């Protein structure tokens, strides 16, 4: 029997009462404020998004606080805070003498999708206090609440540790890759290593057809930017198709070949993919295709160099536009990278491919472990916070089972 079972059996063997959210918590609307009327500081301003709208030098909530985003695409998004914050286009919820704020947060988090569903308004959706104030919350004794919070905190901490480890490993890999590909040379170059533009080291730089291609039930796979994964691969598992005749009519520079580099240039720009197999496919205009000059640069080396921090900084500078950032083919052709001899490139490829393999294992293993932990956390959260209603009393699943056993024993 777990500690939680013991507490339930001792403190609430006959069930748990439930009450409306507004009756057991302190719910307050935010205070209107604009950035231009504030001074910059270190206090997060909570508004309609998932991240602070900006930072100011004053606060209107302190201690444990739950916030619910008030408007926009993120309306209804729940967050838990333990630092001073300024609640603006949002509302806050705090616990009282009979309910712990963190317990309340976990219970409401379990209802996140329902809270999203209460959005009202056409152009700019809103979630108001009135949207959820009548939600009924099981209120077990405080020791039971605290034990539930302790268990769920442990699961959340395990997930956070795994996520932090994955982030640290990625940064470590990026550091070594950047160090290997810096060469300690200036942009003007040395005898051994020169900085060259992509236009200089590529036979062609093109993008996909700017006209929507004809679709078919079978034929040649047509990939979009959503088929480019964060692991720098092309995912062919969910693609549309175009007729073979359409593919055959394309210019040769738009037909991917082994050794070509794909590079996303619109929206989620800056993701390179090295084509390692002779696979026929076509792609949308949001993706560029670069054909390296093999006598100057090895495609695998070019692929690694296009992932460095220095190259990404060039991409950020070249990306233009408000709604969707776009890197033009001209700007792409002028972006530079260090090009040593082919012999040096080969040695670097061996090292970087080894790093890549390690990171790929991490990118598969750790995210899978993180996902498993999240599912485990959600399972226990649902189990711990799911209560079966019976008249004016809420019983836990365990209590319902015990009650059924007692009734069976009497028969």
What are these regions (language model features)?
Residues 1-411:
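Charged, alpha-helix-forming regions
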């Amino acid at each position: 029997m777990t500690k939680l079972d013991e507490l339930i059996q001792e403190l609430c063997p006959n069930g748990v009462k439930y009450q409306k959210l507004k009756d057991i918590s302190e719910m307050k609307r935010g205070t209107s404020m604009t950035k231009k009327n504030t001074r910059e500081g270190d206090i997060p301003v909570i508004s309609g998004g998932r991240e602070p709208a900006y930072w100011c030098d004053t606060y209107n909530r302190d201690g444990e606080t739950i916030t619910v985003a008030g408007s926009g695409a993120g309306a209804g998004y729940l967050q838990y805070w333990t630092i001073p914050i300024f609640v603006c286009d949002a509302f806050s919820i705090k616990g009282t003498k009979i309910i712990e704020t963190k317990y309340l947060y976990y219970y409401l988090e379990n209802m996140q999708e329902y809270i999203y569903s209460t959005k009202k308004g056409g152009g700019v959706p809103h979630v108001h206090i009135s949207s959820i104030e009548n939600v009924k919350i099981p209120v077990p004794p405080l020791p039971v609440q605290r034990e539930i919070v302790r268990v769920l905190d442990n699961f959340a901490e395990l997930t956070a540790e795994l996520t932090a480890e994955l982030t640290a490993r990625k940064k470590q890999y990026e550091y070594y890759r950047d160090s290997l590909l810096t060469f300690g040379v200036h942009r003007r170059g040395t005898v051994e290593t020169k900085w060259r533009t992509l236009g200089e080291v590529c036979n062609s730089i093109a993008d996909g057809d700017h006209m929507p291609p004809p679709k078919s039930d079978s034929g040649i796979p047509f990939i979009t930017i959503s088929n480019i994964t964060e692991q720098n691969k092309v995912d062919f598992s969910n693609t549309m198709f175009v007729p073979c005749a359409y593919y055959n009519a394309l210019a040769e520079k738009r037909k991917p070949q082994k050794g070509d580099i794909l590079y996303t240039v619109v929206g989620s720009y800056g993701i390179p993919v090295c084509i390692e197999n002779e696979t026929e496919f076509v792609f949308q205009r949001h993706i560029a295709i670069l054909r390296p000059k093999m006598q100057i640069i090895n495609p695998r080396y070019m692929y690694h160099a296009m992932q460095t921090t220095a190259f990404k900084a060039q991409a950020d500078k070249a990306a233009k536009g408000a709604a969707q950032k776009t890197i033009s083919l001209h700007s792409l052709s002028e972006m530079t990278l260090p090009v040593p001899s082919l012999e040096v490139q080969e040695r670097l490829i061996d090292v970087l491919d080894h790093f890549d393999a390690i990171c790929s294992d991490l990118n598969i293993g750790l995210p899978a472990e993180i996902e498993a932990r999240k599912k485990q956390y959600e399972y226990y959260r649902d189990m711990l916070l799911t209560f079966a209603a019976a008249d004016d009393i809420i019983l836990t699943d365990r209590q319902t089972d015990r009650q059924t056993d007692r009734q069976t024993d009497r028969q």
